[in-house]
Amino acid sequence: MHGQVATIKDIVLEERPEVVDLHCNEQLLDSSESEEEDSVREQLVEQAQQAYRVVTTCGICKCPVRLVVQCGDADLKVLHELLLGDLSIVCPGCA
């Protein structure tokens, strides 16, 4: 543009529009692959859980009570807090 007002002859279109591929190149997972991913996640959860031996005393007769729990670290801490609080385990003889 050479002036204060644009005219049609001043507008020059040099670029041509290009064809753009609008197809997505993603591939969907088939059901077997998603099942494999689910089983891997389940295995990771199972690995996070471990078996822990817990030794406490009976809430009634005070004899030792042993049990095994399978849980994660966070759940074990919750069980620990419960056993330190009002929760009591009762032996089979007192049950």
From Swiss-Prot:
Question: Keywords assigned by UniProt?
Answer: Activator, DNA-binding, Early protein, G1/S host cell cycle checkpoint dysregulation by virus, Host cytoplasm, Host nucleus, Host-virus interaction, Inhibition of host innate immune response by virus, Inhibition of host interferon signaling pathway by virus, Interferon antiviral system evasion, Metal-binding, Modulation of host cell cycle by virus, Oncogene, Transcription, Transcription regulation, Viral immunoevasion, Zinc, Zinc-finger
Q: Where is this region: E7 terminal domain?
A: 1-42
Superkingdom of this protein's organism: Viruses
GO terms in the biological process aspect are: DNA-templated transcription; symbiont-mediated perturbation of host cell cycle G1/S transition checkpoint; symbiont-mediated suppression of host innate immune response; symbiont-mediated suppression of host type I interferon-mediated signaling pathway
Q: List the disulfide bonds.
A: none
Sequence motif: LXCXE motif, positions: 22-26
For this protein, the record's SUPFAM superfamilies field holds:
E7 C-terminal domain-like
Q: Does the keyword Ligase apply?
A: no
Q: What is its main location?
A: host cell
One Pfam family recorded for the sequence: E7
unnamed zinc finger locations on the chain: 58-94
Q: Where is it located?
A: Host cytoplasm; Host nucleus
The region annotated as signal peptide is none
Motif Nuclear export signal: which residue numbers?
Answer: 76-84
Processing and modification events after translation: Highly phosphorylated.
Domain text from the record? The E7 terminal domain is an intrinsically disordered domain, whose flexibility and conformational transitions confer target adaptability to the oncoprotein. It allows adaptation to a variety of protein targets and exposes the PEST degradation sequence that regulates its turnover in the cell.
Reported function:
Plays a role in viral genome replication by driving entry of quiescent cells into the cell cycle. Stimulation of progression from G1 to S phase allows the virus to efficiently use the cellular DNA replicating machinery to achieve viral genome replication. E7 protein has both transforming and trans-activating activities. Induces the disassembly of the E2F1 transcription factor from RB1, with subsequent transcriptional activation of E2F1-regulated S-phase genes. Interferes with host histone deacetylation mediated by HDAC1 and HDAC2, leading to transcription activation.
The family annotation for this protein states:
Belongs to the papillomaviridae E7 protein family.
What name appears for this protein in its UniProt entry? Protein E7
